[in-house]
Amino acid sequence: MALKMGYATLRWRQPDLSKALPALKKAGWDGWEGRLPLDWLGPPKRLKKVCEDAEMPLCVFTASGSPEDRDWEHVERNKRRMDYAAEMGVDCFMFMSGRKPEGRAMERTDIERAAEGAEQWAEYAAQYGLELSYHIHTNLLVDSAADWTLYMSLLDKAKLCIDVSHAELWDYDPVQSLVDFWDQLNYVHLQDYASCTVRDPGQYNPKWVSVGEAECLDFTAVLKTLEDRNFTRWVTACPGEPAYEGEDAVSEAERSAGMRDYLRRLGY
């Protein structure tokens, strides 16, 4: 079974998608994860045409901010992003947890409130048959293996995106995490780092690199686990540092071919 391989366009700001998406296709990717503002993307009809022309589907769309923020305007803006994601037919709508509380230690009630917000978003998305996917990430509210386990125990409709590098940073074996959270898993991120000199909550400092450049974890084992378990959802690779502000999206897409070649050498 061939895994579906996507590219995370997290560094794109004002890309010419009519040129950048064909470059991703040429680099060998099957789809792309989008994070751009709606006013840049334009109507779904327009974006669908651009994607179809490039044979490069939008596989995942992301939130702007986190669901624990209950401000009415913030929630409404993200509902519009969910509306858009549903009309585009994406596989899932990804979000992360928010920042840690200021001036005090985090408490269990903070995680409970965060999970409650995620479930409210998931309930809204469910009208479209759209799934939410919580992306684990260091230095945010949920910031340890224990926090992660607690948070997932509080979710029902909202599902999970495991970024295997962040699992590894929390000293949670990436392969084991896939197995342990399999029933909630609907998306996977691949990311690589060359070093991390501080491994304390809120202070992790990984030096991100393109997947395969440092091999901070056993990517072959991760991908084989997904293949052996017949994972049918998307697996998306993330670019590394330096941040690509100033580099046009086409150049970045062309350069991403090196990362795609690495994954092919692993058999994927």
Where would I find each of the regions flagged by the language model?
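N-terminal pre-domain/capping segments
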Residues: 1-91, 126, 159, 183, ...
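Catalytic-core regions built around general acid/base machinery
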Residues: 46-53, 117-125, 177, 222-225
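Short, histidine-centered active-site or binding-site loop motifs used for metal coordination
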Residues: 62-65, 97-99, 205, 239-241
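A short helix->loop->beta-strand "cap" motif at the edges of active sites that frequently abuts
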Residues: 56, 90-91, 130, 229-233
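Histidine-acidic metal/acid-base catalytic patches
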Residues: 1-28, 145-149, 153-158, 168-268
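Acidic-and-aromatic substrate-binding clefts and catalytic sites of carbohydrate-active enzymes
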Residues: 10-16, 34-46, 65-75, 101-105, ...
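Active-site acidic/histidine proton-transfer and metal-coordination neighborhood
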Residues: 18, 70-160, 254
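Conserved beta-strand positions in the central sheet of alpha/beta enzyme cores
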Residues: 33, 60, 94, 133, ...
